[in-house]
Structures are given as C-alpha cells and as structure tokens.
Curated annotation (Swiss-Prot):
Annotated Gene Ontology cellular component terms: pilus
Name used for this protein in its record: F17d-G fimbrial adhesin
The keyword Signal belongs to this UniProt entry's keyword annotation: yes
One example GO MF annotation: carbohydrate binding
Record's subcellular location: Fimbrium
Fimbrillin-binding domain: region residues: 200-344
Record-stated family: Belongs to the fimbrial protein family.
Organism: Escherichia coli
Amino acid sequence: MTNFYKVFLAVFILVCCNISQAAVSFIGSTENDVGPSPGSYSRTHAMDNLPFVYNTGNNIGYQNANVWRISKGFCVGLDGKVDLPVVGSLDGQSIYGLTEEVGLLIWMGDTNYSRGTAMSGNSWENVFSGWCVGANTASTQGLSVRVTPVILKRNSSARYSVQKTSIGSIRMRPYNGSSAGSVQTTVNFSLNPFTLNDTVTSCRLLTPSAVNVSLAAISAGQLPSSGDEVVAGTTSLKLQCDAGVTVWATLTDATTPSNRSDILTLTGASTATGVGLRIYKNTDSTPLKFGPDSPVKGNENQWQLSTGTETSPSVRLYVKYVNTGEGINPGTVNGISTFTFSYQ
C-alpha cells in the first residue's frame, strides 16, 4: 500500500510540473529575408516626379503567423525598429536610404500586411498594440514586414541594382504582467537583392536654349507713377513632351539669383535707373516671381506650364517695363533670366 502511494504521488508531481510550463515559446527564425530573391520591378514615370514610389503591391515583404506560441492568458504586443539611415520623408513617413538613387518605405506590424505601421526614424516604436490569449486556450503571435522602393534622384532611364541589405528588427513585447523569461523575443530582417528597371519620361525644348527679346524704346512719360507698366517685348517657349508629362517651370534672376520678387534685376550694363522688368505668362494679370535654378518638384515660385494631356505645350511670355518708384533716368535696359523646366 505504501509503495503504491509513492508511485501515485510521483505521477501527480510530474503532471503538476507540465502544467506550469512557460506560456510563451519561440517557434520562428531569428533571421528572415524580405521579398523574392532576386526581385525585379519596372515602372515608368516623369523625370522630376520625385520621390517616385514603386507601388508593387505586397509582394516585397515577409509575413509569418507562427513566430511565438502563446497560451494561458499571455499578453503580447510588437515593437519595430529600422536600422537604415533616414534620407527624407513622404507624407510623414520616413524614406530610408539604400543607395544614392534608391530608398525604401517600410511598414512593420502584426501578421496582416494591411495592419502594418508606417515606420519613421530609427527608434523602437509600437507597431502592434497587442492582445491577450484566453486563460484556457493556446494560439500564436506572428508579424509582417513590407517595403516599397522609392526613386530619389533625377536621372535618365536606368537600371538600379540593390544588394542584400539588413533592414531592422521586430521584438515581442509582453505586457499586463506577462513575462517572456529567457524566450527569444527579437527577430531580424534583411531585404533580398533586387533590380529596378526605371524608365523616365521628359520633354525636348523646341525653342532655342538662348532667347533674346528685343525691348521696345519708350519714353519716361509712359511710366509716370510707381508701379506703372508698359509692354516691352514678347517671346514664346515651345516643347515636345512624352505622354503624361506635366511641365512646371521656374524663372531665375541671373544677375541676382537670390531674388524672389517679381521684378528682374537689371544687369550692370544697363544705364537706365528707376525702371525694372516684369514677366507675365499668357493672359495672366499677375507677374511671375523668380525662384532658385532647380528642377525639384515644389521648387519655390515654380509654376505650371502644361498638363499631362499636352504633348506639344507652349507658353507666351510678355516682358513689361515697370516704374520702381525711385525716379526714372533714361538709358539702356538689360536683364537676364534663365528658365528651368521640371517634368512631373
């Protein structure tokens, strides 16, 4: 009788110990590859439509529903961190640099791609607030990473190759009294190598690149008051564009490149004083302002020349004398403005 009791007690203790096992275990891989290997993606876009996002869907990613096994009321969330350098932003989301020409938008989160958090910066951030498994049930916790390439720089059509690159990590975050103990909590991700076949569209200038506008001779009496204007000359700019290109332009004051007003600085060869030059486009009643010599989208004082439906756009420019209010002294008037096109 005594021996039977000892055997029964030993079995009871064994069953008790099995019940008290940890409520979380790691069943995934510590190193994971994101996207097909190798990947190849092709897109066409206007030359200056930058940064240009390669919308490839969800196929550049990694998702796994079974990374941690959890049970017994265990509560778990996820944190994510990106290790790549931040080189810009788009709609509040960081653009991470891969090469000088190619960057990434990155999302991290729960198993489902659609619930991923848009990543910003290089610190750990909450990418899945979490949940608690039932006290008498078991389940798994997964994760996902999705990336989208971004073209960063103005270039002609090109093929970009990106080597395998470490992206960052996701870690399991126990909460509400749950503890992971010695269980693996962090997994790492690397982006598989890929190529971008990038085709850009643009325009060709049909007008000579240097345009001389002869200014009409006038008398000071035609500009009696400050702000008075008289048409001095006119010219046109014509282009031939690929389909779908929207043309924007910036005029830059060549004599004073920092000038952001609507009056062109006269060159040192001018002898007249108290007079300036304004430039108008088409039938606009507001003069164009001068900006930096740059094709970057959103450049200061950039203005729209055409829409994406025009393949042979043109613009008529009118140059007007303007009384600057400093007292007019007759003489010669010369001004130089450059124009920079942006193909968006």
